[in-house]
């Protein structure tokens, strides 16, 4: 199963955004499954590719099961892909917002692979599942955690990270940066960041130190998984998490996916790049509204829309 779309010549310059882990909620995608044949086909293909009923966990929970990486990651991806297919099913060509670029936050970068034709839905699902397991194995080998630091200059926080042996793992906005590392290092970094003027420090409820050097054990297995699959050049450029630059070839995307598992997510840089190329409208596709909120804090001129169900798709038609 491959996701495809036509393009139109005029209208606003649109970027698609795809959320990452943390956006999950029990019941997500159920309304799409019940009311859209195209969306239901995505969910069924994901279940078939995994060899188990992920949809049961998505629609019924319990929340603790959905929060597990092996369920949350393919689940968020499935809902985002189902949203795209439901958009195509319900909107005419002149109503369908066509992206000139795409970006996904961490896991969301994998969703972009399927939407831009780099991989089909089945292979994307399998790769996300393998990535999730490799990350979990790395977490078991190198236990750690993450914290959000609000209101501290990036250079100052990078110095805190160096002094405490942790990593800057997500630069979401100028005011919201996430750090990752072992539990002792993160506790020390939170105290030091607060002492140096951070407005707020928040311990995150996560299963590991994602996007840090503690994820290095996942790289070898991820390389092997990626090389076993048939990658294609994207039909729409994907902005890389690690560099904020556009990816236009299969080889560059493979390199990015390997680097991303232990590298910093440069979300602010990615948004700055997209707006610099003329993007004025962002559509966050999938559960949650975190990415749109970040984009708005990065640049208030940005127009934000969210697609998570049929009602939000119909709003695109009216707008």
Where would I find each of the regions flagged by the language model?
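Short glycine-rich catalytic loops that host catalytic nucleophiles or stabilize transition states
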Residues: 203-206, 275, 308
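Short hydrophobic/charged patches on amphipathic alpha-helices used for structural packing
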Residues: 268-272
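Alpha/beta catalytic cores of group-transfer enzymes, especially the acyltransferase/condensing modules
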Residues: 21-23, 50, 115-264
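FabD-like malonyl-/acyl-CoA
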Residues: 2-156, 281-314
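Non-catalytic positions within long, well-ordered alpha-helices that form the structural scaffold/packing
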Residues: 194, 275-278
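Short amphipathic alpha-helix with an adjacent loop that forms part of the alpha/beta core around
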Residues: 315-319
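Conserved functional loop/turn residues at catalytic and ligand-binding sites
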Residues: 106, 230, 278
């Amino acid at each position: 199963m491959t996701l495809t779309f036509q393009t139109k010549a005029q209208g606003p310059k649109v970027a698609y955004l795809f959320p990452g882990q943390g956006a999950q909620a029990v019941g997500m995608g159920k309304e799409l499954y019940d009311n859209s044949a195209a969306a239901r086909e995505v969910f069924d293909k994901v279940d078939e590719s995994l060899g188990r009923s992920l949809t049961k966990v998505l629609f019924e929970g319990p929340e603790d099961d959905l929060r597990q990486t092996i369920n949350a990651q393919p689940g968020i991806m499935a809902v985002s892909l189902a949203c795209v297919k439901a958009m195509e099913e319900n909107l005419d060509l002149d109503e369908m917002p066509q992206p000139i670029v795409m970006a996904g936050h961490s896991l969301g970068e994998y969703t972009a692979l399927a939407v831009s034709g780099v991989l089909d839905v089945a292979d994307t699902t399998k790769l996300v599942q393998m990535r999730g397991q490799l990350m979990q194995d790395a977490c078991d080998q190198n236990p750690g955690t993450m914290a959000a630091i609000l209101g501290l200059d990036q250079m100052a926080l990078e110095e805190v990270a160096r002094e405490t042996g942790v990593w800057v793992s997500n630069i979401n906005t100028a005011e919201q940066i996430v750090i990752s590392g072992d539990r002792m290092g993160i506790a020390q970094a939170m105290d030091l960041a607060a002492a140096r003027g951070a407005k707020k420090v928040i311990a995150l409820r996560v299963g590991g130190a994602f996007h840090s050097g503690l994820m290095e054990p996942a790289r070898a297995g991820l390389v092997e998984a990626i090389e076993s699959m048939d990658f294609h050049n994207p039909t729409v450029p994907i902005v890389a998490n690690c560099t904020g630059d556009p990816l236009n070839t299969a080889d560059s995307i493979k390199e990015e996916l390997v680097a991303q598992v232990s590298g910093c997510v440069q979300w602010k840089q990615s948004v700055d790049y997209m707006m610099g190329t003329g993007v004025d409208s962002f559509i966050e596709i999938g559960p949650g509204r975190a990415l749109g909120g970040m984009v708005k804090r990065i640049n208030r001129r940005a127009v934000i829309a969210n697609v998570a169900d049929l009602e939000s798709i119909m709003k695109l038609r009216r707008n």
